[in-house]
Amino acid sequence: MKIYVVATIAWILLQFSAWTTTDAVTSITLDLVNPTAGQYSSFVDKIRNNVKDPNLKYGGTDIAVIGPPSKEKFLRINFQSSRGTVSLGLKRDNLYVVAYLAMDNTNVNRAYYFRSEITSAESTALFPEATTANQKALEYTEDYQSIEKNAQITQGDQSRKELGLGIDLLSTSMEAVNKKARVVKDEARFLLIAIQMTAEAARFRYIQNLVIKNFPNKFNSENKVIQFEVNWKKISTAIYGDAKNGVFNKDYDFGFGKVRQVKDLQMGLLMYLGKPKSSNEANSTVRHYGPLKPTLLIT
C-alpha cells in the first residue's frame, strides 16, 4: 500500500510539474550593470536557442528556425539595472514585441501592451507584477512607422537609423522609462532600441555582430540594418523555398546588393514556414507571400 501511495503522489507531482512548465513564461535576463560583449552575445543566443526548433533546417543550412506555435505563447525579456528592472514580452512564434513592464514614479508596476498582439489576460500572465487596473493598451500601433512617429524622430528623412543602437544607448533609454512618470516619446524610443537589440539581433547575426563590434558604444544604424529588418520574411521564404545546400538557385537582392550564398546574409533565425521542402520542391518556383511584418507587424 505504501508503495502504491508513494507512486500515486509521484505521478501527481509529475503531472503538476508538467502543467506548471507548460503554463510558465520563460524569462531571459540581461544585466546592464557593467555588461560585457560576451554577456550580451550570450543573451541574444539564449533568445534564439529558446525559440528555435532544433530539428528544423531550411535550404540545406544550419540556420536556426523558429519552432511551430505552441501552448507557451510568450517569452519574457528582463533588463536589469541598479535602479530596477524593465521587461519586454515577445511572441515566441515570431519574436514580435507585444508589451513592456516598468515601474512608474510612485514605484507601481505598470504594463503597457499592443492590443492587437496580446490580451489583458495574457498580459497578466506575462507580467503578474501589474494588476489589471495597472495595465494600459498603447495608443499607437505596433509598426515601426507608428513607433518612430511617437518617438518624434521622423522629421525629414530621419528614422530609427539616426536614433542608433548600442548597449550604452539601451541602458540610457531603459532608465528613461524606469521609475519615471510615463512620457510617450521616451517610451517609444526605448521600444525602438530594445526591439532591435533583442528580436532583430536574434534574427540577424549581422546586427548582433555590429553591437558587439561597437560595444558598448552607441553607433548609427546603417541602411543595411533597416533592409534586414523589413525583409525577414522575404529572406526566410527565399531560403525555405529556393535554396539548396546553402546556395540560392538565383541571385537575390534584399536591398543591399545581390546575394547567392546564404551564409553571406549572416542570418541568426528564420521564420517558421512549415516542414522543410524536399530538394525537388526547393528547385521549383519559390512561393510569394504578402508584405513582411518583421518585428511588430512592420511593412
Swiss-Prot record:
Keywords: Glycoprotein, Hydrolase, Plant defense, Protein synthesis inhibitor, Signal, Toxin. Residues 1-24 form the signal peptide. Disulfide bonds: none annotated. It is an enzyme of class 3 (hydrolase). Residues 278-299 form a propeptide. InterPro entries: Ribosome-inact_prot_sf, Ribosome_inactivat_1/2, Ribosome_inactivat_prot, Ribosome_inactivat_prot_CS, Ribosome_inactivat_prot_sub1, Ribosome_inactivat_prot_sub2. Its EC number is 3.2.2.22. It catalyses: Endohydrolysis of the N-glycosidic bond at one specific adenosine on the 28S rRNA. Glycans are attached at residue 283. PROSITE patterns: SHIGA_RICIN. One of its GO terms (biological process) is defense response. It holds the Pfam family RIP. The active site is at residue 200. GO terms for molecular function: rRNA N-glycosylase activity; toxin activity. Seeds and leaves of the plant. It comes from the Eukaryota. Ribosome-inactivating protein of type 1, inhibits protein synthesis in animal cells. Useful as immunotoxin for pharmacological applications. Belongs to the ribosome-inactivating protein family. Type 1 RIP subfamily. This is Ribosome-inactivating protein saporin-6. It comes from Saponaria officinalis. The gene is SAP6.
